[in-house]
Amino acid sequence: RLAHYGLKYRQKILLYGSPGCGKTMGAERIAWNTGLPLVKVRFDAMVSSYLGETATNLREVFETAAADPCLLFIDECDALAKSREDAQEVGEIKRVVNTFLQLLDEYEVTNGLLIAATNLTKFLDEAVWRRFDDVIEVPKPTDLEIRTILKQTLAAVEVGSVDWDTIVHRLNGFSAAQIVKIAQNAAKRAILDREDLVIQEHLEASIKDVIVSHAG
């Protein structure tokens, strides 16, 4: 099925873009479309204060992913490079980065994919960049994508009268994560209002809440 979507076997992809732009959603969608189980790990959570364990943790993740074909998704992959700013840990961090590079070189799972994501490209080690077959920017959602995200998020609830063109226009420039949150909050508002349908007013109020929270 990978070939059907124009993806090579053993392909390694790096996604980059601003926070919340939809990198994780993109990886999840690829996993769903290709039928591959998703193995997801965050590097910022893996790199603990005791860095001596990090290389071991890395190997365990890659061993798990290599056991069966899957989509290995590595989020916040810049976390290792960012940690090098701490001069007291430079030696250990270099060892961890070298381990990661070695694991990327060795990662060969038939019909599997490896996707990494980062918000901070300037902090990512150049040697890491070179390990990926494709480097793809994930921009803010287009109007069509905004509409799709809204309708998919609200698919499990009844939706009443909504001027989608107006809502989409208001959400232009919002991140995918913000759009999902707005749709979810609109559904919660409908429940609190004891309404059977999510309507225009619920979405408008949710948009206003996000704008106000960011302004504060």
Residue positions per predicted region:
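Walker A/P-loop NTP-binding motif of AAA+ ATPase domains
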Residues: R1-D165
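C-terminal alpha-helical "lid" subdomain
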Residues: D143-G216
